[in-house]
Structures are given as structure tokens and as C-alpha cells.
A protein has these predicted regions:
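N-terminal beta-propeller domains
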Residues: 1-102, 139-178, 232, 318-396, ...
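Beta-rich, blade/repeat-based domains predominating
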Residues: 66-67, 120, 392-393, 438-441
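Small/polar beta-strand repeat architecture
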Residues: 5-22, 97, 101-119, 155-175, ...
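Catalytic or ion-translocation cores adjacent to nucleophile or general acid/base/metal-coordination motifs
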Residues: 414-456
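Surface-exposed extracellular loop regions of Gram-negative outer-membrane beta-barrel proteins
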Residues: 402-419
Length: 473
């Protein structure tokens, strides 16, 4: 019997699974194929050969896995990064970037062959932020066509864990420079090197561990430019005022007044204990501040000051006392972010092993400042509240921030339709429950293409006006 081969003009169904073999009753059966290899399916049905490739250069180590990453400054300045075992190389305009001796421009990195596939990244202009759970966040910077550098991200004021709720206290032995931080109970481990500590009224970064109760740390710069754990104010504009000048014996508050009006600017706050030296009549230690304005600092009752006019060169400092109010940094050895994105002028980290469902948003327009607060441009932290603890796998910035976790897909947005994201209006809504694999997705148009948790399906997450939510059919 003669064999007949039917002509096929339409392949819009793509490759068919073996489960559909013989299903001639399905309309899409006639539009599919067993294998479509080295061809592109056209929207109108036909096939065309895929574009060819061109040999540019051999990777540094052909026997090891190597990854290619796009680095795009704009549509005219597009680079390809070759990332391999502890190195990066760069390509542009069909050629490898070399130095004056025709040697490939190369950066040394800490990402091993096994870690390269898990590196995630987000770019803004000439800077690309890279994250991997085994390494602190880093940034790749292009200074010129042949000048590239990679450095650790210097996070001076966050992100931080929740405040301490134990009875353990911390005490620093200095206000500036390198200080010893002593804990009242075992607290520090070798994994804390490089970790931030918020204590007293400042931040310090741990540089070494002396014991389980003592860490050496470098004091960090504050937002107002001061680099200290407690304020230090040297001036000759402070006068002293008796709260009970008639000696009635009634309970009263004595006060300091500053004609320069610098108490708040210098960092003095209610609840702080202060020490003063250099005064003719009023040197004191560890007095409690109960009220403060730019020009007035009021101390707690029971502390008597003698009336004294301004003129002495005095130094007022915040006292260093053992304090239960402290916080440890959220990023440390064994718990670094595993995904990163930019959203509404904020750098966002997520997916640490210690807080797998928490996102850390930088301050608006200040990408490396994660200090939280309630002002509209302050940093914020948000933890997904759900029945299961599913690690955040990826972040994708679109009109809303798409968050893929191992158990489902979410979006982060402001509560108001046209409002920017702030610490007081953030909300997160679950959209689907497919779960995502730890593979960086692609944003194409308004759709996010991601790999499902089992790595067997490619799904398209897109907004549906019918359901007023995202769907991934």
C-alpha cells in the first residue's frame, strides 16, 4: 500500500506531548509536531530556521559551566558578561573586550562554578547588583568601556532584624572608630563577621569576633553625616537653669539651654542618658533626658543643677550604658539575600535563609540605605503572611512588584491605585498557587515568564481585567 504524507502548513500548536499522540479528534493535533528543533514557529503558522550563531571567543574554561548575562545601559550600549568559576569577562559589538595588550578584561569574583547558575541580578544604569545566598550582596560597576569593578555593597544602616526582646544587654566601649561591643550573655559567632549591629543611637559593623560575648566593630556613618554611636557636642553656648530657683523643695526638672539651638541636630533624644564635662559648677554623669527641643534639654527630677550662664567650653555626650535596646543585621554569613530587584526607586532584597518570606526595601532613591521609618521615603520591611513558610524565589519589577515563592505567586503594591509605595500603605496579595522554581524569570511586555516549581512547565503570569488579578494559565 502506498504511503501518504499529508502536507502541513500550520505549526502553531508547537511540540505535542506523547500523551496526545493519536488524538486526531483534537483540533490542535493537526497543528502540532513531535519535534520542532532549530526552527521558530511564526504567529501565522509557518516555521522559519532559527538565526545562526557566530564564534566570538572561547570561554575561559570550556570544561566548566559558564553563564552569559546581559548588561544593558541603553539600547545602544549593550554588553554580554561571561560568568564562570571565580571570574567575569565582557563582550560588546561582536567582540571580546581586551586591554592594550590584547588580553581579555577580566574580574575576579567569589562565585564558583556550582554557584554561578544561582546568581540573581538587577541593574540600574552602570551598576548591576548581584546576590547569592552564600555571599554578601555585590555590585558590578562599569566606569568605562574597559574599566569594570566588583565590590561588596556597603550597607551602613540596615537591613536589620526585629528589636531584641531578651534580657541580654550590649555595651560599646567607645563612640567612634573601632569599638568593642560586650554582650551580657553569649551572642556572637564567627558567622557574624561583616554583620551590622544597631545599638545605643548608632550602627556598627562587626569586623572580628573575640569571644561569644565580645565583638570588634567599626562605627558607621549616620544619615546626618555623624559617625558615632552616641552624640558628642562641644560648645560654649550652653547655660544651666534651676527648675526650683526659690528652693521650695517641690519636685522639679532642671534644664540646659543652648542659644545655638543644636540639641536635636546633634542627636540628643528623650530617654538618653547624658554626661557633661568642662563646666565650672555642673559636671554630671548619666542623667536621664525627659524632654528635648532644639534649644532646651530637660533632665529627670532629682538631679539638681546650679544656675550658670553660658561661656564655659563644655562637652555634652550621650552616655554609653548597657542597653537591652539593640538589633542585629538581617544579612550575615549563611543568610544572605537570594534575589534582588528595583521597584519604584527602591532596591529590594529578599529570600534569606533566616527570613525566607521577608522583603527588604531601601529608602527611596538611596539604594544602599535600608534604615526603616514611617516617612514616605523611608525603608521598609515586609513579610508575606501565609499558611506556609515558602522561600521567595524571585522578584520582578513591573507596574507592581511580582514575587514568586516556592508555594505561590504574589504582587506587592500600594493600597491606593495611584500612590507610590511607602512604609504605611504597602499591601501584598496572592495571585496564583503554582509555585516557582529558583530561576530568574523574564519580563516580556506586561507578562512574566517563570518556571513552575517542579521545573516541568513554563508559565506566563499576566494581569487579567476579568478577574482583576494576575493569572498564569
Amino acid at each position: 500500500m502506498a504511503k501518504v504524507s499529508a502536507a502541513k502548513q500550520n505549526f502553531t500548536a508547537g511540540e505535542l506531548t506523547q500523551r496526545l499522540f493519536g488524538r486526531t479528534d483534537l483540533g490542535r493535533y493537526d497543528n502540532g509536531a513531535t519535534t520542532v528543533e532549530n526552527f521558530l514557529v511564526q504567529p501565522h503558522g509557518g516555521l522559519s530556521r532559527r538565526p545562526g550563531t557566530r564564534y566570538i571567543a572561547e570561554v575561559k574554561t570550556s570544561s566548566a559551566k559558564t553563564r552569559l548575562i546581559r548588561f544593558q545601559f541603553n539600547v545602544e550600549q549593550v554588553y554580554v558578561i561571561e560568568m564562570g568559576n571565580n571570574y567575569m569577562r565582557f563582550y560588546k559589538d561582536g567582540g571580546q573586550i581586551v586591554d592594550g595588550s590584547s588580553n581579555a578584561i577580566e574580574l575576579t569574583t567569589t562565585y564558583t562554578t556550582a554557584q554561578v547558575p544561582d546568581v540573581k541580578f538587577a541593574q540600574t544604569a552602570d551598576v548591576m547588583y548581584l546576590v547569592h545566598p552564600a555571599h554578601p550582596p555585590r555590585k558590578l560597576t562599569r566606569s568605562s568601556h574597559t574599566s569594570w569593578s566588583i565590590t561588596d555593597v556597603d550597607l551602613k544602616r540596615g537591613a536589620m532584624l526585629d528589636p531584641n526582646i531578651t534580657t541580654t544587654t550590649l555595651l560599646a566601649n567607645g563612640r567612634t572608630g573601632n569599638v568593642n561591643i560586650t554582650a551580657s550573655a553569649s551572642l556572637f559567632t564567627s558567622n557574624d563577621v561583616g554583620r551590622l549591629v544597631q545599638l545605643h543611637k548608632g550602627f556598627a559593623k562587626i569586623t572580628s569576633i573575640t569571644s561569644a560575648t565580645v565583638a570588634v566593630a567599626a562605627v558607621q556613618e549616620l544619615e546626618d553625616g555623624r559617625t558615632e554611636l552616641m552624640p558628642t557636642y562641644a560648645t560654649n553656648t550652653i547655660s544651666f537653669h534651676e527648675g526650683d530657683p526659690d528652693n521650695t523643695g517641690l519636685e522639679h526638672n532642671d534644664r540646659l539651654e543652648d542659644t545655638a539651638g543644636n540639641f536635636i541636630d546633634q542627636g540628643f533624644e528623650v530617654g538618653m542618658r547624658v554626661t557633661l564635662t568642662g563646666s565650672t559648677s555642673n559636671n554630671f554623669s548619666n542623667l536621664l533626658v525627659v524632654a528635648v527641643t532644639d534649644t532646651t534639654l530637660v533632665i529627670a527630677p532629682g538631679n539638681d543643677l546650679a544656675a550658670e550662664a553660658a561661656g564655659d567650653s563644655v562637652t555634652l555626650v550621650g552616655s554609653l550604658v548597657a542597653d537591652k535596646k539593640w538589633r542585629l543585621g538581617a544579612f550575615f554569613i549563611g543568610s544572605y539575600p537570594s534575589t534582588v530587584a528595583f521597584y519604584e526607586q527602591r532596591l529590594v532584597f529578599a529570600g534569606t535563609s533566616n527570613q525566607p518570606q521577608t522583603m527588604f526595601f531601601s529608602q527611596s532613591g538611596d539604594f544602599e540605605n535600608f534604615e526603616i521609618g514611617t516617612d514616605a521615603d523611608d525603608g521598609l520591611q515586609y513579610t508575606i503572611g501565609s499558611n506556609e513558610v515558602n522561600v521567595i524565589r524571585y522578584l520582578v519589577s513591573s507596574s507592581q512588584l511580582v514575587v514568586g515563592t516556592s508555594g505561590g505567586e504574589f504582587v506587592v503594591r500600594a493600597s491606593g491605585f495611584d500612590e507610590p509605595l511607602t512604609p504605611t500603605n504597602t499591601q501584598i496579595k496572592q495571585q496564583t498557587t503554582f509555585g516557582s522554581a529558583p530561576i530568574q524569570p523574564l519580563l516580556i511586555g506586561n507578562s512574566t515568564l517563570f518556571i513552575q516549581r517542579a521545573k516541568r512547565k513554563l508559565r506566563e503570569l499576566a494581569f487579567s481585567s476579568e478577574s482583576d488579578s494576575y493569572v498564569a494559565p
